[in-house]
């Protein structure tokens, strides 16, 4: 609609344009329509060479023939009695009974019509079925001769009135039915008073059955006659056309005869109705009649059920006949006994009128929608007489009614961390059904086909709190005793069944067998068990918290008692034993006093480390996640956490746990929550290095130590590197003392000599041999992906706490730099595709634009002018990305073979950097040894 301000002329113009467009379109259509011959070929037009006048006559003839056929059918239409018999005309049940049973003989119009053949064939097959289902009766005569009371019992009293007189009348005079009805009424009161002693419903089938033989024979006679007469109706041929008026004259006699029959039937029908009404008024039976018979008749007409239905609505409650084939015929209570009968199993199939009648009989409110009526009846059924044979299918929502039964289903990524984790890469089918058995042990059944992969590195590490029995292959094994897990699952008392779900996400329901089990138990016992579980869990939680506090105090004491000279660490085994502790800081952050720890952020649990966390077999990746808690700094430092994990979530801080990636890579996640501002980053506990003394990693399972520090991301790329880093001695003075392993490695000394000779570091740097584990020749970083050629991270990244000595730390710290400078994880363990790319782009632009780092001697990637400040406070204390060292020197300097045999961490890794970012000779590493 154009704006109102536009003038009327504009609208006019628009309308005319639209009209013109429509006109053009129609003209085009007319022009492009196919030829007549084409239309004839496609049977759209008829091929006729006749003149138009002939065609017009042909049409007239067709119409006349149609009209003729219709007139014939109207003339021979069935009378009202036949309509009642065929369940087309709704009438009161008593009338219908009399007519259907055949006690009233009436002239059948349909005998001479072809119409009846079709209609009776269509309608009659239902009757035999219904009769047979109602039980067999010896002979039709038996019912006719049967005692009036017997025939009356199953029907309502009014039926007796109409049936018995008709039975006597029909043999004498059809049209004098007024007189005889008067004697029988006295029979009715006894039948009413003795309502309780009424026999079974067998009499109902008796009445119905009696008409079956007759109707079958009539049908056969009728169909024979109709077949004989059919040619008469269709005998008019095209050239013998006779106009309708002449035809009527000629066909008047038969039409009159059929019309006379219809009139006869009409009279008889009216008389029956009048009789019926008189009887009703005379005996005042309206009060005990069932729901209006008309609705029953309509229901029958619409649903096509056999006439049995209308009878069975009025059956007594004691009647035990089987329901009719459609499931609609039911034995209800009647006016005779007044007791409500058993409801059928399928209430949904009942009509609203029937439901209301049932409710009336049970003196329940009748108003409301069909569903409400059904609910009311169901409730009544459950209270009074639950039918054991017909259990109702419970609604899906009402399965878990019982207090003790709970099945918790959540995506695998969200276990125990609540909203703290971003469930990034999970398919909806990867639902973990976590169930707590009565022993308090949490069991997990994953419904995904592969073990769910954690979208963020912290996800699993928060869960595992050192269950020594769990094997590394069992991805959820470490969680079994996690207090966090149990707390999240046990907000309410639980008595839970372990059930492996199918791939339907979130539809967790208890198996019926289990439900029966639970119901059988004593409820008091269950409650006691639950109380015990809760107490045990709270006790465990308190113990963990005390442990956290103790370790926190220990760390603070050690931090105060630190001396500048750290202990040297041996490099004897092919697995690097990294005992050095990272004391480096973001160069931007001034050395402040050590901040007291948030108890929930301390990382004590590293001494629970699972001895089998380093699994032999597929290559593992140690992903350490550090939650650094930035304090307010002069430069704006928005805290960008990897997931929305608050510090309070990391209470039971976890040992490195094993997660199997979708590519088969094991990711060992350790959480070392760090305080970004305590210069020593001392929350990486000193016990950590010795926590895995006895597990040397086998050669194939080289692990990559990707530390993901959750670092503040600073406002501008260059602001990161503006400040000069603190001196080496200062940094060292704040470094916690590491456990000394005694044998200072000769290889490390050689490395320092080489570096000093090449002019890469100053001579006074020879002092700290304690940082061997941190040497990170970047060319070998991430399993041969082009990432690997990055220079080792320079001093401005805070190196996180070293991994346990059992895990051979890769000499690649590029990721630390990437994360510390951007605050984002470089490689997430799962399916994160494009995210790392943007991170690397940011980093690339930062490194290219920052001028503070360009005063360093050229590194192997001189082409991209990436130089790093040789900061003495860096964890390595030496910048190993030396231009004079060839890539092969790095291979020799590294701590042996296993480091190179890494499998790719993620499928997106090779695409992280463009290859022009690297210098030529850096790319000549042994990529194939990595793959």
UniProtKB/Swiss-Prot annotation:
Residues 151-162, 191-215, 459-473, 732-746 have a biased composition (Polar residues). It comes from the Eukaryota. SMART domains: RPEL (SM00707), SAP (SM00513). The lineage of its organism: Eukaryota, Metazoa, Chordata, Craniata, Vertebrata. Keywords: Actin-binding, Chromosomal rearrangement, Coiled coil, Cytoplasm, Disease variant, Nucleus, Phosphoprotein, Proto-oncogene, Repeat, Transcription, Transcription regulation. The modification Phosphothreonine is found at residues 305, 313, 447, 450, 456. Phosphorylation at Ser-6 by Erk inhibits binding of globular actin (G-actin), unmasking the nuclear localization signal (NLS) and promoting nuclear import. The keyword Glycoprotein does not apply. Residues 347-381 form the SAP domain. The keyword Nucleus applies. Residues 110-256, 290-344, 444-476, 558-577, 674-746, 763-816 are annotated as: Disordered. Residues 216-231, 763-778 have a biased composition (Basic and acidic residues). This is Myocardin-related transcription factor A. The record marks 3-4 as: Breakpoint for translocation to form RBM15-MRTFA. Residues 6-23 are annotated as: Intervening spacer sequence 1. Residues 50-67 are annotated as: Intervening spacer sequence 2. Residues 310-320, 678-694, 784-799 have a biased composition (Low complexity). The gene is MRTFA. GO terms for biological process: actin cytoskeleton organization; positive regulation of miRNA transcription; positive regulation of transcription by RNA polymerase II; smooth muscle cell differentiation; wound healing, spreading of cells. Its main location: cytoplasm. The modification Phosphoserine is found at residues 6, 124, 139, 156, 310, 312, 317, 320, 333, 385, 446, 449, 454, 458, 482, 492, 507, 511, 685, 691, 695, 792, 807, 859. Transcription coactivator that associates with the serum response factor (SRF) transcription factor to control expression of genes regulating the cytoskeleton during development, morphogenesis and cell migration. The SRF-MRTFA complex activity responds to Rho GTPase-induced changes in cellular globular actin (G-actin) concentration, thereby coupling cytoskeletal gene expression to cytoskeletal dynamics. MRTFA binds G-actin via its RPEL repeats, regulating activity of the MRTFA-SRF complex. Activity is also regulated by filamentous actin (F-actin) in the nucleus. Residues 180-189 have a biased composition (Pro residues). Interacts with SRF, forming the SRF-MRTFA nuclear complex which binds the 5'-CArG-3' consensus motif (CArG box) on DNA via SRF. Interacts (via RPEL repeats) with globular actin (G-actin), thereby regulating its subcellular location and activity of the complex formed with SRF. Either forms a trivalent (by binding three G-actin monomers) or pentavalent (by binding five G-actin monomers) complex with G-actin. Forms a nuclear ternary complex with SCAI and SRF, leading to suppress MRTFA-induced SRF transcriptional activity.
